[in-house]
Amino acid sequence: MNNAELTELLKGLVAIPSPSRQEKDAADYLQQRLAGFGLEPVRKGNNLWIEEEGRGDGRPVILLNAHIDTVKPAAGYSRDPFTPVEDGDIIYGLGTNDDGASLVALLEAYVRLLPLRRSFRMIWSATAEEEVCGEGGLDSILPELGKIDLAIVGEPTGMKMAVAEKGLIVLDCTACGKSGHAARDEGENAIYNALRDIDWFRTHSFERVSDYLGAVKMSVTMISAGTQHNVVPDNCRFVVDIRPNGLYSNAELMDIIRGSVSCEVVPRSLRHGSSHIDTDHPVVRRAGSIGIELFGSPTTSNQTLLDFPSVKIGPGDSARSHTADEYILKSEIAGAVEIYVELLEGLEL
């Protein structure tokens, strides 16, 4: 494929709304286009993958992964988010930066690497439900892929390599009290009870600090209490956003939190674990040898689902993701293809 074909493939995806769990039309389009390129993908649900021949030949396997779903359009778009527009080097449209550019760049890298002699096999995949960490996305096809030795997860990182990624825990907390009339000295105010726990979330510092991800971060982001001005509230609900740093398991963090606060604490999910890769891993050493900068990512991705080594690297800028007038540069895509190929061509696992 040439750069013009990659651009047209990306623009075709942008033109098809594909919010999480509604990716069918985008998957249909991509499946058809891949067949037109002579690539016959396997499909499960709204997930597609292409597997190089030779399963079971003993070579290690590298998974190249990007996602086809998007968030819903942000407020403030000055143009139709589903009408891709080229303006010089820029392509505007929802999903250009997150994650269409990585998808097409990894596909082109896969195609270029196929005829080259390598010590590993490749699987390229375009998966659904990444933005919601859904069970119908990458997680649903991993059992079909066999043993994976390394994943390259394409996300907008400016082609820096994330060797660590924060996880995510969202807590629904409820502080209880006893209702009463606000004019009398009666009842137990649940808001005051909640404040003690909120202050703990605000001030507590976890001891273990990651070199790449820093400390565990906790933020109270939503709060709700009371029914009317003259009734002492008997419950106060609040939400806490927690970003684990790889040095605590999610279960360990939950044990610490529940042992420190008095409110009821219910995690929405414990699936979003943090991830990190040994900096002595061959792919990290290879990245260093060709001048790729390493960093720790504060945002989550499909890496949270993987129990084998992975890194995150892709064209674009994370700051453009989930924003109005999202865009990617064509030069960023072309440059990413070259870096992916250089990174993998010389890799020995």
Predicted features and spans:
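Active-site metal-coordination/substrate-binding segment of hydrolases
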Residues: 33, 59-123
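Active-site beta-loop-alpha junctions enriched in small/polar residues
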Residues: 19, 67-69, 127-131, 157, ...
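Metal-dependent amide/peptide-bond hydrolase catalytic core
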Residues: 4, 22, 36, 163, ...
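Short amphipathic alpha-helical face segments that pack within enzyme cores
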Residues: 29, 101-112, 193-196, 335-342
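Hydrophobic/aromatic beta-strand patches that form the interior of the parallel beta-sheet core
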Residues: 62-64, 125, 150-152, 311-313
